[in-house]
Amino acid sequence: MPSFFRALFSGLIASQLSWAAPSLLHPLEPRQQPNCNTASNRACWISGSYDITTDYEVKTPLTGVVRQYDLTLTQAENWLGPDGVVKEDVMLVNGNILGPVIHAQWGDTISVTVTNNLKYNGTTIHWHGIRQLNTNLQDGVNGITECPIPPNGGSKTYTFIAHQYGTSWYHSHFSAQYGNGIVGAIQIDGPASLPYDIDLGPLVLSDYYYKTADELVVYTQSNAPPASDNVLFNGTNINPANTTQGQYKTITLTPGKRHRLRIINTSVENNFQVSIVGHSMTVIESDFVPVDSFTTDSLFVGIGQRYDVTIDASQATDNYWMNVTFGGGGFCGKSNNPYPAAIIHYNGASNSHPTNKGVAPADHECLDLLNLVPVVPRSIPTSGFVAASDNTLDVQLSTTTRKWTINGSTLDVDWGHPITQYVINKSTAWPSTDNVWLVEEANQWAYWLIENDPTATGNALPHPIHLHGHDFVVLGRSPNVSPTAQTPYTFTSSDVSSLNGNNPIRRDVVMLPPKGWLLIAFQTTNPGAWLMHCHIAWHVSAGLGNTFLEQPSAFVAGLNTNDVNQLNSQCKSWNAYYPSKDIFKQDDSGV
């Protein structure tokens, strides 16, 4: 039978749309304003009450301000893309390949109405990294927290509080749909661990393919993923095959000033190494976690990860390349653009292209930085950890089905019957392919050992692992080796002594080394159904994910009638639509 997802492209209304660089960041109206956050003191937020040391998981400056946004999803064919190549099919947010920035302040309420004007596809929008404290039904994952928003005018208003601050992004969680363009940035203003003068806003880095995400999903079911056709910087770049087409992204610095730049990797396949010729970057935040500042010449940014950095405009007034490179012997991704780059332009310099290409940075080998020290500390017991069947997740690729499994099971959700609906109806009869792990105790550390196919006979791959609803701590990982070495490491009792529970790295996306292991833990303080998955689109599409069902009784007790009515109404609308198209079947994990 034809693919349901593939049906998106079978009857598009022809439209010849030209690409224009979107205006990403909309300034906030001067409502709630911090009264002590200045260029010389970014650590303060509200004098005497909230600053960089405030534990944002415990205390939030609720402002009463509602930031309202509207996102309208449409589709087009024969679309002229940012690098001058016409794409057969594309999906757009408010008419652009990159949606508007959702911009708020710490403690604001964010309300986003999503209207689905796609022709055949449902959709949901996930607010990546947003904790969704006690608002699990707003997490935007079809088959887990809700049913899809039906096409041809269906809508949903997502409402949640910005308990965290920093930088993130939103994207569709309907199959691999975000690879077709349903992506945008999130900026939540708050304190910072280092002073700066100018906030440059988000820099969205993304791989870019001329084929549709659907075509690539099918291709990767029996082949290694192809190189990306290009790499975009805030939705633009030149065409590597014809440099007269497209344009470089230009980031303007003011000489003598310190600038904050919010780097986001929204790719489906490519992990990036980022560097700037002649400049270092000072890291002040990773994902939504403020960290003690430190300086580096380059950053490894995995899919879904974010780094907020400061850049001092202390060099000669000129133009400089910002370069993206690929490490790990091709295991981190690759592109047909041999030199993906943007231009760092000093105000007052000419408009000519930089002349110094710089040198490739040291290879990060698809591994995260280890010197991320959270400003707000945590202490986690590690000495008593014992690996067991109820806390170990074994990731494997089936060589026969080409599906990914966790403990032998491939994720395959039912769009029309989300896990939350089972829980609300006091049923545990969800399908085994929902890959549900019950986490019932409150206010505990839940430890999870993730092992990446150490016994594989072929090559294992690194995976950017993302958890919804929580920041997790990274207590340890297998030794640092190149993915090309394919050295197997299995966690043993002797590894316990190497674990770090003294204010360890804390974030929501971390790289799982090939044939290695990773030990993470999260606090059970947020009831709901929370997806954990690889953020390589083809991997989660092929089943690499599971759901932690956390405190189900407390989750139900915390719901109100409006929450439940909205869930049931949306599922009713979706299930009225989906059977009417019964020749179009879900043919991947659904998320």
Swiss-Prot record:
Disulfide bonds join C147-C571, C332-C366. It is found in: Secreted. One of its GO terms (cellular component) is extracellular region. Pfam families: Cu-oxidase, Cu-oxidase_2, Cu-oxidase_3. Cu cation 1 binds at H126, H466. InterPro entries: Cu-oxidase-like_N (IPR011707), Cu-oxidase_2nd (IPR001117), Cu-oxidase_C (IPR011706), Cu-oxidase_fam (IPR045087), Cu_oxidase_CS (IPR033138), Cu_oxidase_Cu_BS (IPR002355), Cupredoxin (IPR008972). Its EC number is 1.10.3.2. CDD domains: CuRO_1_MaLCC_like (cd13854), CuRO_2_MaLCC_like (cd13880), CuRO_3_MaLCC_like (cd13901). Residues 66-189, 198-356, 416-551 form the Plastocyanin-like domain. One of its GO terms (molecular function) is hydroquinone:oxygen oxidoreductase activity. Cu cation 3 binds at H173, H468, H533. Residues 1-20 form the signal peptide. Cu cation 4 binds at H463, C534, H539. Keywords: Copper, Disulfide bond, Glycoprotein, Lignin degradation, Metal-binding, Oxidoreductase, Repeat, Secreted, Signal. Gene3D superfamilies: Cupredoxins - blue copper proteins (2.60.40.420). It comes from the Eukaryota. It catalyses: 4 hydroquinone + O2 = 4 benzosemiquinone + 2 H2O. One of its GO terms (biological process) is lignin catabolic process. Its cofactor is Cu cation. Belongs to the multicopper oxidase family. Lignin degradation and detoxification of lignin-derived products. This is Laccase. It comes from Cryphonectria parasitica (Chestnut blight fungus).
